[in-house]
Amino acid sequence: MNLISKNKITFIFLFSIFLLPAYGANKDTKAIYELIERVTPGYSSQYRLEIIAPDNGVDVYEVDGNGKEIILRGNTPVALATAFNWYLKYTCQAHVSWFGNQLNLPEKLPQPRERERRVINGRYRVYMNYCTVSYTAAWWDWEHWQKELDFMAMNSVNMPLFTIGLDAVWYNTLLHFNFSDREARAFLAGPGHAAWQWMQNLQSYGGPLPKSVIDRHAALGKKIIARQLELGMQPIQQGFSGYVPRELKDKYPTANINQQRSWCGFKGAAQLDPTDSLFTRMGRVFLEEQARLFGAHGVYAADPFHESCLLYTSDAADD
C-alpha cells in the first residue's frame, strides 16, 4: 500500500485551504457571495465582503474599493446585498428589476469613485401581502423564487411574508381532527385563490387540491424559507386565529363555531370561538405542523376579520 508522508499531507492540507473561496469562513458573507454569483455570474471573486457593526442600532452598509477589489460592508447579509445593488446602480450604471436586467458589465469591474456609507431606513422592512402571491406568484417555480429572494435582499427587505406551503400545514392539521384525505384536500382553495383563503374569506374554491400540488408546495416552501434565513431575513409565518372549515361543525357539533357572512358572492367562512377548548387544541396542532415543515421563527400574521365583521349575539348587539 502506498503511503503519503506527513510533509505531503501538510502540503495538501494547506494547499486545499488556499483553494477555498474567500467566503468559506463566514456564513453571512458566504450567502452574499453566492447571491452575487447568481446575479452576475463570474464576478464574485472581484468583491471582498466584510461584516461591520450597526450604526447606533440601525442597519448600515458601505461601498468602497482598494484598487483591486470592490469592498462591500454591512452589518447583516441584507445590508451587504443592498451595498451590492448600490454599487451596480451607481458605479456600473447597471440595473436589476422585475421587468428585466441591464447587466452589461466590463470584464474588470470599476472601482467606486469614493467610499459610500448609508443607513437603511426602518428596522422592519416588510414585503408582500397575501394577495401578492396569488396575483403574481401562484405558479412560480424555485428558479423564479430565487430571483425574487435575491431582489428582496438587494432592496433591503428583511421581513417577507411566507405563505408557500400553507396548504400542506392545513392538510396535515385537518387529518388530526377527523378529516379524511379528500375532505382535507376539498377544504383547500386553488393556488390562484389561496390568498383569500389565508385571509379567511373563503374555502374550497378551485379544489379539491391534488396531493401532488400540496407536496410540491411544501417542498418549494422549504427551499424558500431556508433561503430567507440564509439571507438573514425574518420570515412572517401564519398564525392561527380560529378560521376553520365549515365542516368542522359536523365533526364537533358541541364546539362554538360561528358562520361568517357571505363575502363577494362566496359563502362565508367559519370562525371557531377562541374561548372554546377546541381553539387551543387546533391552534397548537396547526403551529406544530407548521414548525415541523418550516421551523418556527417567531413572527406570525393572523387577521380573523379581514373584510368581515365581528359576530355578536343578540344580547351583545343590544348593549
Feature annotation, model-predicted:
Residues 315-319:
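A short, hydrophobic C-terminal helix/tail in secreted or cell-surface proteins
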Residues 52-54, 66-78, 82, 91-92, ...:
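Aromatic-lined carbohydrate-binding surfaces of glycoside hydrolases
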